Swiss-Prot record:
MF annotations from Gene Ontology: rRNA binding; structural constituent of ribosome
Name of the protein this chain belongs to: Large ribosomal subunit protein uL22
Source organism of the structure: Rhizobium meliloti (strain 1021)
Function description: This protein binds specifically to 23S rRNA; its binding is stimulated by other ribosomal proteins, e.g. L4, L17, and L20. It is important during the early stages of 50S assembly. It makes multiple contacts with different domains of the 23S rRNA in the assembled 50S subunit and ribosome. The globular domain of the protein is located near the polypeptide exit tunnel on the outside of the subunit, while an extended beta-hairpin is found that lines the wall of the exit tunnel in the center of the 70S ribosome.
Subunit structure and binding partners: Part of the 50S ribosomal subunit.
Keyword rRNA-binding among record annotations: yes
Length: 129
C-alpha cells in the first residue's frame, strides 16, 4: 500500500529510458553510470563501447533507448543531446544458500538495481544571432 509514487516530470527538451531489475549491485552499476554523467551522448556511447565493465553493455543499450526516445517521441536533435542524469536505485535482493563445511549453510545475497538515464537537448554555443 502506501502513497502513490510521484512521477518525475520531464521538461520539453528531455527524454528518458529506464532499465529495471538489472542483475548487478547498485554500487557496481553506479561506477559505470558515473562515467557518462554530463557527457555528450556520442562520447558516452564511445566510453561504454570500450569499457571493460561487464554491465557497460546494458548501460549502453539503455542510453541508446533514451536517444531513440528523444528522437522519435520528443523530436529532439540527436547531435545536441547530453546525458543530463544517470542515476541508480536499489531493486530486489535474491537470497540464496551456499553450502559450507560441516553441514552448515550461509546466505548469499544477489542484489539487483534499477537504472534511469535522462538525456537533454542543449543549444549550441556560439551561434550567430
Amino acid at each position: 500500500m502506501g502513497k502513490a509514487k510521484a512521477e518525475r516530470r520531464l521538461k520539453d527538451n528531455e527524454a528518458q529510458a529506464v532499465a529495471r531489475t538489472i542483475r548487478v549491485s547498485p554500487q557496481k552499476l553506479n561506477l559505470v553510470a558515473a562515467l557518462i554523467r554530463g557527457k555528450k551522448v556520442d562520447r558516452a556511447l564511445a566510453e561504454l563501447e570500450f569499457s571493460r565493465k561487464r554491465i557497460a553493455g546494458t548501460v549502453k543499450k539503455t542510453l541508446e533507448s533514451a536517444i531513440a526516445n528523444a528522437e522519435n517521441n520528443h523530436d529532439l536533435d540527436v547531435d545536441s543531446l547530453i546525458v543530463a542524469e544517470a542515476f541508480v536505485g536499489k531493486s530486489i535482493v535474491m537470497k540464496r544458500f551456499h553450502a559450507r563445511g560441516r553441514g552448515r549453510a550461509s546466505r548469499v545475497e544477489k542484489p539487483f538495481a534499477h537504472l534511469t538515464i535522462v538525456v537533454r537537448e542543449v543549444e549550441a554555443k556560439g551561434e550567430a544571432a
